[in-house]
A protein has these predicted regions:
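Short Gly/Pro-enriched turn/cap motifs at secondary-structure boundaries
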Residues: 115-118, 185-189
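Amphipathic, non-membrane alpha-helical segments in soluble helical-bundle scaffolds
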Residues: 9, 13, 34, 38, ...
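Glycine-rich flavin
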Residues: 36-46, 51-149
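Short, basic, glycine/proline-bearing loop/turn elements
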Residues: 21-28
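Glycine-rich beta->alpha junctions and the first turn(s) of the following alpha-helix
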Residues: 187, 193-249
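DPxDG-like acidic metal-binding loop motif
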Residues: 139-177, 181-182
Length: 249
């Protein structure tokens, strides 16, 4: 267990306070380079921030959402971009926990500190149903923190499936996609929210997909009832927490 994790009533407590001064110090560098400094990511990783919502069986801490959001707000008081990109990366551990177990087993096979980005907008996605899974290509915008991540979650609408038209999230390793530098914003400069591009279709097996309605209906594969919270409720709060922290600054 990280030195930042302390057992409280058999539940770990993550303390991000020791890295807040570094995050604040790094803010100008992140703004200039339009992505979070490596040292900020590594500091959050060492404090266990990215493992807060990850199941214990994969090396995580299974912290409560309340504790996770409090940490995100504390970070945002020092730098909103770090809370935005870092929080989005961290919350994906929860989505992996409610996907088919084989997906998490692959992602966290080598380390529980694997980082995952996302872009859920399906507008630029092309999806084809094939034997055992799907072929995916297209372009997805605003993938915050993607330059620090070795996996990504991408949204797509399936129109040729026996179950009818529906939305899924597709989990892909870094070798399956490119990151195109498109992030030249007026705010949240350091989030590095660049485009994810897949020019030639890549295969995504069925177990590395997440049906949207499963997330809404609280379908999960964990013993902890915390994972019954609908996925969307976690995500909308992780992107609103930075505003609360910034307002407190």
């Amino acid at each position: 267990m990280s030195q930042a994790a302390v057992e409280t009533n058999n539940m770990p407590s993550i303390n991000v306070a020791p890295v807040l001064s570094l995050i604040e110090k790094n803010a100008p560098e992140g703004k200039e380079n339009r992505q979070l400094p490596d040292s900020s990511i590594e500091a959050l990783r060492e404090q266990g921030f990215f493992r807060m919502l990850l199941p214990k069986k994969y090396g995580g801490y299974e912290c409560t959402p309340q504790e996770f959001f409090r940490s995100a707000i504390d970070i945002a008081e020092r730098d909103m971009s770090t809370a935005w990109a870092g929080g989005i990366i961290a919350v994906h551990a929860y989505q992996l926990a409610i996907m088919p177990p084989q997906a998490a087993e692959e992602v966290y096979a080598d380390t529980p500190d694997t980082l995952i980005s996302s872009s859920y907008n399906p507008a630029g996605a092309k999806v084809k149903t094939v034997d055992g899974g799907f072929e995916l290509s297209g372009r997805w915008g605003w993938s915050s923190g993607s330059g620090h991540c070795s996996w990504t979650l991408l949204g797509g609408v399936i129109t040729d499936h026996p179950d009818g038209i529906h939305y899924r999230t597709f989990l892909l390793p870094r070798s399956d996609y490119e990151i195109e530098e498109t992030w030249f914003p007026m705010g949240l400069h350091a989030t590095g929210s660049n485009d994810i591009v897949i020019d030639e279709p890549v295969f995504v097996p069925e177990h590395r997909t997440h049906i949207q309605m499963d997330g809404f209906n609280c379908v999960h594969h964990q013993e902890n009832p915390m994972y019954s919270i609908p996925w969307a409720q976690l995500f909308i709060r992780v992107v609103s927490s930075p505003s609360i922290g910034a307002a407190k600054h």
